[in-house]
Amino acid sequence: MTKADLTLSYIDGRPSTVGIKAVNEVLRTVGVHASQTPSPPEARPILEASKTRALSEDEQAQLISMFSLHRSDLLAQIQLAGRTPEVHDGGHLNTSEHGVAPYPKVYDMQAMDQDAKHLVQARFGRLHVNTTDKGVGIDEVMTVVSGGPMTWFYQLPDGAVVKLSVPVVETGGPAWRLSYPGKRPHGAFLDAEHGLIVAYAHGPEKFVMRYEVPSAQGSKALATNPWIDFGGDAPRLLDE
C-alpha cells in the first residue's frame, strides 16, 4: 500500500498538487507552509493512548511540552512561510479568543462526541479570519502529532479555495506542521476518529474569530466553503 502524501485539491477540477515541495510552492503565495517534525520517543505512550480515549489535562500539558515551540521557533515558522510576524517579535505567546482557553492547547478528537464534532466542523469548516477589532491577525501553527487524516482550507490569490489533505500520522512517525496567517480566509474540517493537534497561536493578546469582515482580503468567501455541504444533519466533506 502506498503511503499517503500531502495533497492540495482544487474545486475547479485542476489536477491535484501532491508532495510537500509542490504543495508549499502553491501555498507560499498566501503565507502558508507545511513541514514535518520528528515525534519524540517519550511521547509514544500518550500518542498510543489517544487512539482509544481522551487525554487527561496532565497528559495534554506533557504533550505540549514535548512538542513545544519557543518564540524563536514560532518566528522561524513565519519566516519559512514567507511572512513577517503580525506583531513585533511574535507578540503574546498565550493569545486567546474571548471566553476561550488560551494557546497553546491540544485538540483531541477522542474528547469530542459526535454532536461536539459536528459543532466544531460547522464552526471551523466555514472560512473565517482571526483578528482584533483593529484588524491585527494572529500567527498560527498547527501540528498534527497523531491520527487523522485532517483537512485544512485556504484561499489562493485568484480567489480559489483549496483543500489541503494532511495524511494520517502513525504513532512514532513524523508529525505534520502547518504555519499560516490567521488574517487570511481559512478553515479546517476535523472528522477523524482519533487524532491530536498541538495548536499554537500568537500575536495580539486577544482576538475574535470572524465570519464577516467587509474589508478583509477575500471577504466574499467568509462564512462559506465550497468543499463542505452544510445542508444536512451534519457537515459533510465533499470530494473534488
Describe these PLM feature segments:
Residues 1-23:
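Intrinsically disordered, low-structural-confidence terminal and linker regions
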